Every structure is written in structure tokens, then in C-alpha cells.
Amino acid sequence: MKALDGLRESLYPSLDFQLYQDDQVCSADASQPLADSVGAHDLAWSERMCPLPLAPAKSPLLACPESPDLCLCALQKTPLGRAPQDLGEDASNMRHQPPSLYKASTDSEKLTIKDSLNREEMGNEPERGAYPHLPPRTSSFPDAGLDRKSLSPLTFWPWLPPTLISKEPPIHIYPIFPGYPLLPLPYLFTYGALPSAQHPYLFMLPPHSTYPTVAGPSLLMTASGSGPRIPQEKTLLLHSGAFQSAGHTLHSQVESRSSRDTRTPGQAGVAAPTRRAVPGSRAGVIALPYPLKKENGKILYECNVCGKNFGQLSNLKVHLRVHSGERPFQCALCQKRFTQLAHLQKHHLVHTGERPHQCQVCHKRFSSSSNLKTHLRLHSGAKPSQCGLCPSYLTPNVYPKLHHRLRAPQLRGLTHTHLPLASLTCLAQWHQGALDLVEKKMGWTVDKVSSESKGKQG
């Protein structure tokens, strides 16, 4: 028997219970004798109860041990004339009911009453014009009768990752309007502001929101690929008064940022400078120091110094370098300058020693094709050109040009020299003596050239 009593004491220890009656809570030990709660004839048991501080809720609930089970009985104020049997039926309905269900029902009733009061208070406020009305959301929230403490946060917000969330429900952000508070009227909770460090997903939008958003895409970020959220560095104010003042600034920031994004590079100011065209000028003609003439609807590319005509504008520009003395192309080895790039490339062959052009008759090589053409005239026996000032016939191609230049300058050159007739006569005589000296030293005579060509052919 002692072993059975010890086992019973270990399985069913002394049951301490609390009695919630009106504004006081009382505790008692199960070992003390208690009167029957149904009969309620002997009230001497209430004198042995120890009054405790006020309970958080007014619930006439009494816990009474009956055999090894714990039964809950409700103490209700009954009107006069009601039979005790009716009280027994009410008490039997409350027997064997788990404490958690009763607690859940009371909590749900409190939340329901609280929500209804909040909605009545918010409904009395006047509606604000010039902004769309926000209907209450009933699809994404569960029924008020369910136990909100027993449900996990993933039930309300399935897109959130499993993070530590406090007991206060998170606050959602709905469409941002300058004159509206942060939350819509039906869901403006009275909970205090929570620090954003403990709740990284505090400012979240529901995944299936039916309200249009005003904030631009640059202010919203995606968290783990689901549900847009506002970045943490853009902290929002939770109280409605401060947000009403900050709503206009947020809207203006969004508009200014979108306007900056839609600007073209030409409208960016200093970052993309625009080119201003000179009035009355065309592209490509700005480099010329003088206007071009037109004849029969065509532009004449004529040099204003020597009057030479060209078929293209680029050729005229290259020709103008001869008169201006400009030589933009310089050799990196000998620092020699040239007016054209082709002349510089040809000059590089002198430093490299390359001779790409070869004569097919004597297999002599040349650095340029023009020199090869001049050399081929020796093998062909072509008659040389005759000088207009003297009866000499010259075979090489370079020598007739030099001969003509030294013999007598052109009339156009004579007009620029402004020399008298006597000076011109002396110059012609000097040219004649110089030509004779060159011919003697170089051996450029007609007879010698003809004999050399005949000997090679024979």
C-alpha cells in the first residue's frame, strides 16, 4: 500500500489551482477540503482562500480536483428563482474542457472586441478627398476566431524566411499617398514602433496586393526573390503625422529620380556637351579658310592661291598644306616631316632598306613603283620628252622636271618674283650654266643613254 501511495503521489502531486472571481484571484491546495461547487450550500471554504492581486481578466472560473482529473467549473451570477439543477447543467458543460481552448476563446473574443472598437473609431473620421478609397482587406488575414498565438508567422506571411519575430504582429505598408497615413484605416494597429534591426522584414508588402503602388521601382528591392521591400537605409516613419509631412518629399524624390533616369545624354548638361554648328557652314567645309564657289549646281574645289582645281575636298586640303607649309606627319627616326601619310610610309622603306618592287628584265629592285616605272623606260627605248626651252631630249622622268624647272620658271612664278627683265635674263643664263654642269657630272646625254640601251638589247 505504501508503494501504491508513493506512485500515486508521484503521478498526481498536490494540485495547486487558482480561482478567478470578480476582481481577485485565490489559490488553494488540493489537500484542503473543498465544498461542492454545484450545491454551494456550505460557503466555509471561501474563508480558507488567500486573496491574491487582481487577475488580468475577469473570468468567473473555478478549478476543482475531482478524483485524479482536473475539472473547470464556472461561477456565474444567477438571478433569483433559478433552480440549482440549471447550474449543474452549465457546470457539466464546462467539465473536461482543456484550459488552452478556453483561453484561446477568451483571447479571440478580446481581439474581436478590440478590432471592432478600432474600426468604429476609424470609421467616425471624415473621408479625405482627392485620393482613392482603400477597401478593407479580408482575403490575406485569417478569421478572428482562430488563436493567433498558436499560429506560426509563416501562416500570416508565407513569403517570409524563418526569422525571429516578436509577439507583436508586423506592420504592413500599403500604397503611399501624401495625405494618407502609413497604414490603411481598417488595419491601423495601435502597437508601438518596433526597431528595424530586430525586424529586417518589417516593411513588407503582401505578395498579392490589389492596391496600386506609387513608389518607383528604384525604391523597392526584392528580398530572396519574393516580395518587394523598401531598403533599410530608407527608414520610414511609422506615426501618421510625421509621414504626412514626409509623403510629399518621398513623392518628389521618386519623380526627380525617374526624370533623371529618363534624360538623354544630350540633356545631361556638362556631362554630354553639345556641338554647336556655325551658321551658314557645312560639315567638312569648316576647315577651309575661304568659301567655295559653285558652278552649275556643283561645288568647285579650287585653290585660292594657285587656282588649281581638285575633284575632292580632301585633295584640296592636302594641297593647301603646300602653301601653308604644314607638315603634320613626322618620321620617328630622322624627324623628317611630310605633308601626306603616304609619303611618310614610303619614307620608312629608306630606314628599313626594303625594296619591294623588282624589275623583271634586270632583276633590279626599287623602293617605290614610280622608280620602277622610270627604270622600265630604259629597257623599252621610249623616246624621252623634249624640253620646251632647249632642243635636248632626256630619258629619265625625274630629269625633265628638274630641267624644265631650272630652264625657265613659269609665267605664274615670274609674276610672284617681281624681278625686272634684266634679272630674269641673268637668271636664265645661270640656269643654262647649271644645267650644263649637271649634265657633265651625271653624264645625262642623249647619245650615252641611247648607246646604253642598245648595248643591253644586243
Swiss-Prot record:
Residues 84-109, 249-275 are annotated as: Disordered. A zinc finger (C2H2-type) spans 301-323, 329-351, 357-379. InterPro entries: Zinc_finger, Znf_C2H2_sf, Znf_C2H2_type. One of its GO terms (biological process) is regulation of natural killer cell differentiation. Gene3D superfamilies: Classic Zinc Finger (3.30.160.60). Disruption phenotype: Mice show a reduction in tissue-resident memory T (Trm) cell population maintenance in the skin, gut, liver and kidney but not of splenic T-cells. Double knockouts for Znf683 and Prdm1/Blimp1 result in a stronger inhibition of Trm cell population maintenance. Display an enhancement of natural killer T (NKT) cells migration preferentially to the white pulp of the spleen in response to chemotactic stimuli. Also results in the derepressed expression of a large number of genes implicated in the egress of tissue-resident T-cells from non-lymphoide organs. It is found in: Nucleus. Expressed in tissue-resident memory T (Trm) cell population in non-lymphoid organs, such as skin and gut. Expressed in innate lymphocytes, including tissue-resident natural killer (trNK) and natural killer T (NKT) cells in thymus, spleen and liver. Keywords: Adaptive immunity, DNA-binding, Immunity, Innate immunity, Metal-binding, Nucleus, Repeat, Transcription, Transcription regulation, Zinc, Zinc-finger. Induction: Up-regulated by interleukin IL15 in a TBX21/T-bet-dependent manner in tissue-resident memory T (Trm) cell population. Up-regulated during the differentiation of natural killer T (NKT) cells. Down-regulated in NKT cells after antigenic stimulation. GO terms for molecular function: DNA binding; promoter-specific chromatin binding; zinc ion binding. Signal peptide: none annotated. The keyword Repeat applies. It holds the Pfam family zf-C2H2. GO terms for cellular component: nucleus. The keyword Zinc-finger applies. Transcription factor that mediates a transcriptional program in various innate and adaptive immune tissue-resident lymphocyte T-cell types such as tissue-resident memory T (Trm), natural killer (trNK) and natural killer T (NKT) cells and negatively regulates gene expression of proteins that promote the egress of tissue-resident T-cell populations from non-lymphoid organs. Belongs to the krueppel C2H2-type zinc-finger protein family. This is Tissue-resident T-cell transcription regulator protein ZNF683.
